[in-house]
A protein has these predicted regions:
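A glycine- and small-aliphatic-rich helix-loop capping segment at beta-alpha/alpha-beta transitions
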Residues: 1, 43-49, 105-110, 159-168, ...
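N-terminal glycine-rich phosphate/adenylate-binding segment common to multiple enzyme folds
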Residues: 1-55, 146
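Glycine-rich phosphate/nucleotide-binding loop
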Residues: 130-203
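Glycine-rich phosphate/diphosphate-binding loop of Rossmann-like nucleotide-binding domains
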Residues: 48-125
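Short, acidic/small-residue loops that bind anionic groups at enzyme active sites
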Residues: 1-9, 113-122, 164-178, 188
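Short acidic loop-to-helix transition motifs that present clustered carboxylates
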Residues: 11, 122-129
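Structural motif
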Residues: 2, 24-28, 35, 87-89, ...
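Short acidic, glycine/serine/threonine-rich loops at helix termini
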Residues: 38-43, 99-104, 131-134, 154-155
C-alpha cells in the first residue's frame, strides 16, 4: 500500500480559513500495483489501436484489494488507540465502473471483521468536494491508485504544499519511504526546497 499522511502542523500556513483546519490528520491509502496505472506505458500493457485511439484498463483483483482494505482497517485501529477517529472511508466510483463496484463490495465484506472501526463510502468526485469543505471529519481513506494519486496531492495542498507531504510504500516484507514530491530536480540549487517531507518520511 502507498501511505500518504495529510496532517496539519502547528505554526505552518493553513490553506483553509476554518479553525477546524488545525485538526486535519488524514491518511490516504492507495494500491500501487493495480488500478488504472496498471496499464501505464512503462508496463507496456496499454492497447494502441491507431494514432487516434488508445485504451487503458483499470485492473482490480480480489486478493490485492482485500489486502489493501485489511491494511486500512488495521491502520485505523492503531490510530484509534492514539485518539484518532477510528474511521475508514472507501473512496471510489462504484456507480460507474464495475471494477470500482468490486472494490467497494470487498470493502463492505471486510468491514464486518472490524466492528470497532467506523466504515463509510464516498464517490471520488464527492470526496474532492468534502476534502475542501470538511477534511477534519476523515481519518483513513482507501482508494484505487489514480484516485489516491490525485486526492493525496490535493491533501498536500491543504496543509502547506508538497513540501509537507511524506510517503511510504509498504509491502509485506519491505518499505520504501520518500517525499511525495520525489527528488524535485526542478528546484535544485534554488534555495527553496522544504526538507520537512524528507524528515517526516524518515520518521
Amino acid at each position: 500500500a502507498c501511505v500518504r499522511p495529510v496532517k496539519a502542523y502547528k505554526n505552518t500556513p493553513q490553506r483553509l480559513s476554518d479553525k477546524n483546519a488545525e485538526k486535519i490528520d488524514i491518511v490516504v491509502l492507495r494500491e500501487c500495483t493495480e488500478g488504472l496505472f496498471y496499464t501505464a506505458a512503462v508496463h507496456n500493457r496499454n492497447k494502441i489501436a491507431n494514432n487516434d485511439e488508445v485504451e487503458d484498463i483499470m485492473r482490480i483483483t480480489r486478493n490485492t484489494t482485500m489486502r489493501l482494505h485489511n491494511f486500512a482497517f488495521k491502520l485505523a485501529e492503531k490510530r484509534k488507540q492514539k485518539g484518532k477517529l477510528g474511521k475508514v472511508t472507501c473512496v471510489d466510483k462504484a456507480n460507474v465502473f464495475k471494477s470500482q463496484a468490486l472494490f467497494r463490495k470487498i470493502f463492505n465484506e471486510i468491514k464486518d471483521d472490524f466492528p470497532n472501526i467506523e466504515a463509510d463510502t464516498c464517490y471520488v468526485d464527492a470526496m474532492a468536494l468534502n476534502l475542501i469543505r470538511q477534511p477534519w471529519e476523515y481519518d483513513v481513506m482507501v482508494m484505487e491508485n489514480i484516485f489516491g494519486d490525485i486526492l493525496s496531492d490535493l491533501g498536500g495542498g491543504l496543509v502547506g504544499g508538497m513540501g509537507m507531504a511524506s510517503c511510504g510504500e509498504i509491502g509485506d516484507n519491505h518499505g520504501l519511504f520518500q517525499p511525495a514530491h520525489g527528488s524535485a530536480p526542478d528546484i535544485m540549487g534554488k534555495n527553496k526546497a522544504n526538507p520537512l517531507a524528507t524528515i517526516l518520511s524518515g520518521s
